[in-house]
């Protein structure tokens, strides 16, 4: 029973960290990366789909993405979607290939992104701590119902605390890496 609760809590903590990783990927660092366009959706035969599902998205160089829609009719739709998105880039279209130069980030914009990254990291830490709290409550209920001893309760709480510390440490490392990449010019 303890192992089931621990495994569930550990899985949920890991998912929280993975979610943070995907959120960090959406924060632009000034370098070209295909995941920048993940949030951009286009209307494709009546359904909203990510740009990556209607076009090839590649990195041409450190500051340029290329987008090549698979259908000629999608060029203007994709271009409009990219321009109206809030990622702050403007595609340059030549034929059916769009080049998207990544403007260098201003100091102010970098600080905004760092603030956003810190906020995301803090929300993830809170989620991890809430998972720990829930697991500890489950352990205490088992102890109250005499399904586990006081020693087993203490061991379970130590085990969940150790997992919490590991996941929070991962979040801190990811945040430090993201801050470093945002401050690179």
UniProtKB/Swiss-Prot annotation:
GO molecular function, one term: ribosomal large subunit binding
Compartment(s) of residence: Cytoplasm
Primary location recorded for the protein, binned into one broad class: cytoplasm
Chain segments annotated as coiled-coil in the UniProt record: none
GO BP: cytoplasmic translational termination
Domain of life where this protein originates: Bacteria
Keywords: Cytoplasm, Protein biosynthesis
A GO cellular component entry from the record: cytosol
UniProt entry tagged with the keyword NAD: no
Classification via PANTHER family: MITOCHONDRIAL RIBOSOME RECYCLING FACTOR PSEUDO 1, RIBOSOME RECYCLING FACTOR
Protein family according to the UniProt entry: Belongs to the RRF family.
HAMAP family referenced in this protein's UniProt entry, alphabetically: RRF
Function of the protein: Responsible for the release of ribosomes from messenger RNA at the termination of protein biosynthesis. May increase the efficiency of translation by recycling ribosomes from one round of translation to another.
Name of the protein in question: Ribosome-recycling factor
